[in-house]
């Protein structure tokens, strides 16, 4: 359950260590991020003890969710031996910090996991409210990517080239099916 919510139930440290060790054995070219939400239930020190066990089991990056102040970040990052990833979740327990502020607290990576979703959801609300009220989307055209811009963003022409390079299967008609001239 998300570290920003209540009523979390954690797996035991031993179970999580076993999961990290299994991921380490199975990996080829990836980094293992170990996450803990134990700060709320076990306190900062307990969460750090857990994380250090996960690191011993093979975690490459530490992630403790829902830290609530600069002291917590600085303490956590100073007591582990791997890079720390911060989670900037708007409207959560963690105060708003910039990437520079996170870096100053010892964080090597920062994620904004729901930011684009929140922005997109607000834009969709605006779109459908406009359609409901105006019956059209023209008032929002300046907020939209043009077709050319969209194709650039999604690399459309790369996919078109890939598609053209793939052989197309043709199912031959059976004896009882009519054969149609290919005039499509």
What function would you assign to each model-found segment?
Residues 1-112, 118-129, 156, 162-182:
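Alpha/beta enzyme core
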């Amino acid at each position: 359950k998300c570290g920003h919510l209540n009523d979390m139930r954690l797996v035991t440290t031993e179970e999580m260590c076993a999961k990290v060790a299994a991921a380490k054995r199975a990996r080829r070219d990836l980094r293992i991020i170990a996450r803990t939400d134990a700060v709320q239930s076990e306190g900062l020190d307990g969460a750090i003890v857990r994380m250090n066990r996960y690191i011993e089991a093979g975690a490459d990056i530490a992630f403790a969710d829902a830290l609530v102040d600069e002291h917590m970040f600085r303490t956590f990052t100073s007591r582990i031996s791997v890079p720390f990833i911060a989670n900037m979740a708007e409207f959560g327990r963690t105060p708003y910090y910039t990437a520079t502020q996170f870096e100053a607290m010892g964080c090597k990576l920062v994620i904004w996991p729901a930011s684009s979703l929140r922005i997109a959801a607000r834009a969709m609300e605006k779109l459908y409210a406009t359609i409901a009220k105006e019956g059209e989307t023209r008032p929002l055209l300046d907020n939209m990517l043009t077709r050319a811009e969209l194709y650039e963003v999604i690399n459309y022409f790369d996919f078109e080239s890939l598609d053209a390079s793939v052989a197309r299967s043709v199912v031959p008609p059976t004896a009882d099916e009519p054969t149609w001239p290919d005039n499509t």
